[in-house]
Curated annotation (Swiss-Prot):
Family: Belongs to the FapR family.
Pfam family, one: HTH_DeoR
HAMAP family noted in UniProt: Transcrip_fact_FapR
CDD domains: hot_dog (cd03440)
Organism for this UniProt entry: Geobacillus thermodenitrificans (strain NG80-2)
Name recorded for this polypeptide: Transcription factor FapR
BP GO annotations: fatty acid biosynthetic process; negative regulation of DNA-templated transcription; negative regulation of fatty acid biosynthetic process
MaoC-like domain segment(s): 102-168
Biological role stated in the UniProt entry: Transcriptional factor involved in regulation of membrane lipid biosynthesis by repressing genes involved in fatty acid and phospholipid metabolism.
InterPro entries given in the database record: DeoR_HTH (IPR001034), HotDog_dom_sf (IPR029069), Transcription_factor_FapR (IPR017275), WH-like_DNA-bd_sf (IPR036388), WH_DNA-bd_sf (IPR036390)
Keywords, alphabetical: DNA-binding, Fatty acid biosynthesis, Fatty acid metabolism, Lipid biosynthesis, Lipid metabolism, Repressor, Transcription, Transcription regulation
Lineage: Bacteria, Bacillati, Bacillota, Bacilli, Bacillales
Disulfide bonds: none
One term of GO molecular function: DNA binding
Gene: fapR
Keyword match Lipid biosynthesis: yes
Length: 198
């Protein structure tokens, strides 16, 4: 049985409050209505679109955790970060990110998402990419969502922090990279358990 508009909107607010990352498509499926109906409901309730909700959550949650660059300079939207350990961002590939003829994403967008996430995960005032080894695994098309996952995996003998970034569309790996990061505080901290790498 379909819910009344008032009941659906109440449940919509509750659902978005519990999970601000839910998409309009997922909401439409959950409430058995069209995506357009969900968008109209959101407009009536003054609930911003997913991208704006993600930015709002990121600003509230991560502003004090990301030191190496302003959040608005990160390519993609950070949805989770543990400084000097791991981070996750999402990047929705739109028409402006792809080649017109093939609708395949330009590689520099995937690299920029991964590289800026590698910088953001470094908990220091200054973090720069000293070296990057990257691999494009498969093409990404317009309309796909890329989820990049960064993990600090160790340090080089010269003291650079090593960050591995893997990017996925769904469960499929589309990009991988290993970034050696220079940081302004390159001395090994006491109790740092990261292993050294070559």
């Amino acid at each position: 049985m379909r819910k009344s508009k008032r009941e659906r909107q109440r449940l919509l607010q509750e659902t978005i409050r519990e999970n601000p990352f839910v998409t309009d498509e997922e909401l439409a499926e959950k409430f058995s209505v069209s995506v357009q109906t969900i968008r109209l409901d959101r407009l009536e309730l003054s609930i911003p679109e997913l991208r704006e909700r993600i930015k709002h959550v990121a600003r509230q949650s991560f502003a004090d955790k990301v030191r190496a660059l302003p959040l608005e300079e990160v390519i993609g939207d950070i949805i989770d970060i543990e400084p000097d350990a791991s981070a996750i961002s999402i990047f929705d590939v739109k028409e402006e990110h792809v080649f017109r003829r093939t609708r395949i994403a330009r590689g520099h967008h995937l690299f920029a998402q991964a590289n800026s996430l590698a910088v953001a995960v470094i908990h220091d005032e200054l973090a720069l990419t000293a070296k990057a080894t990257i691999r494009f695994v498969r093409q990404v098309k317009a309309g796909e969502r890329v989820v990049a996952k960064a993990k600090v995996t160790g340090k080089t003998k010269s003291g650079r922090t090593v960050v591995d970034v893997n990017s996925y569309v769904g469960q499929e790996l589309v990009f991988s990279g290993t970034f050696e990061m220079y940081r302004s505080n390159m001395e090994k901290k006491d109790g740092d358990s990261n292993e050294y790498r070559d």
